[in-house]
């Protein structure tokens, strides 16, 4: 438990930031899930469109330190390679 007033304020700030980050992380995961569902259904056009929406969401999350930038880039790369395999 925080004892000083500054520690109590820091706890409140952390709670607010956690809520914002949780929302952004959920939004990011939802966009990735849309791409994965399109890939699973075999619909290449839908997957490409979904990836066009998911990539900026992932990069925004990386920019805001919700996920590491390398993790975001790796996720985009793996999704793109899976979409490329749909065409074969």
From Swiss-Prot:
Family, per entry: Belongs to the bacterial ribosomal protein bS20 family.
Pfam families associated with the record: Ribosomal_S20p
A single BP term in Gene Ontology: translation
Protein name, entry field: Small ribosomal subunit protein bS20
Source organism superkingdom: Bacteria
Ranges for region Disordered: 1-33
GO MF term set: small ribosomal subunit rRNA binding; structural constituent of ribosome
Keyword entries, A-Z: Ribonucleoprotein, Ribosomal protein, RNA-binding, rRNA-binding
Biological function: Binds directly to 16S ribosomal RNA.
GO cellular component: cytosol; small ribosomal subunit
């Amino acid at each position: 438990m925080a004892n000083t007033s500054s520690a109590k304020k820091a706890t409140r700030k952390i709670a607010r930031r956690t809520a914002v980050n949780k929302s952004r992380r959920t939004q990011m995961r939802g966009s990735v899930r849309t791409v994965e569902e399109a890939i699973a259904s075999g619909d290449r056009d839908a997957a490409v469109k979904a990836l066009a929406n998911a990539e900026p969401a992932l990069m925004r999350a990386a920019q805001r330190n919700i996920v590491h930038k390398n993790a975001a880039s790796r996720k985009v790369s793996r999704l793109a390679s899976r979409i490329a395999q749909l065409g074969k």
